[in-house]
Amino acid sequence: DLVRSRGLGDVYKRQYLQYASRESERLRVGEKQTLATSVIASGFPYDKDVNPDNNSDNVARIIPYVRDVRRLGSAAYDISCVAAGLLDGYWELALHEWDVCAAELILAEAGGVVCDLRRDRGISIVAGNGAIVKEILKYVR
């Protein structure tokens, strides 16, 4: 399983039932327990200008409670950054399997969890360590 960021040169890998790595460095999710000190990321659907479920309401709800919200790259890259402890959490709506499959496995090997929001449109997930996922779920719908 592999996630590659061509622009940054990062390569994230998962060794089946062993560990996840970036450039041979073993990955571990961050240990933060609250959103107040957390940097999290999210994304927006390609049709955000006409889609009423465009995630902007979730950003507005959560932003007062976090240290910062970022938008870095693809869903796979952002989830891999959570696996590396570079981000504390991530959520996004209306994704596809190819957006997240490899990164979810990398995150699991790094000790993280993914929660499926089970929405009507595509795959919608929250990712991070267990505590941060629970915190994000208070604000993301």
Regions found by a protein language model. Give the residues of each.
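Conserved acidic residues
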Residues: 9, 38, 88
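Short loop segments at secondary-structure junctions
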Residues: 15-17, 25, 45, 110-111, ...
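Short loop->beta-strand "edge-of-pocket" segments that line small-molecule binding or catalytic clefts
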Residues: 26-49, 63-72
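A conserved active-site-flanking secondary-structure segment within enzyme catalytic domains
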Residues: 10-36
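Solvent-exposed alpha-helices and their adjacent loops that cap or buttress functional pockets
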Residues: 5-6, 31-34, 61, 117-120
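Single conserved hydrophobic/aromatic residue that forms the stacking wall/gate
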Residues: 1-12
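Oxyanion/phosphate-interacting regions
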Residues: 57-64, 77-141
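Anionic-ligand binding region
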Residues: 22-27, 53-60
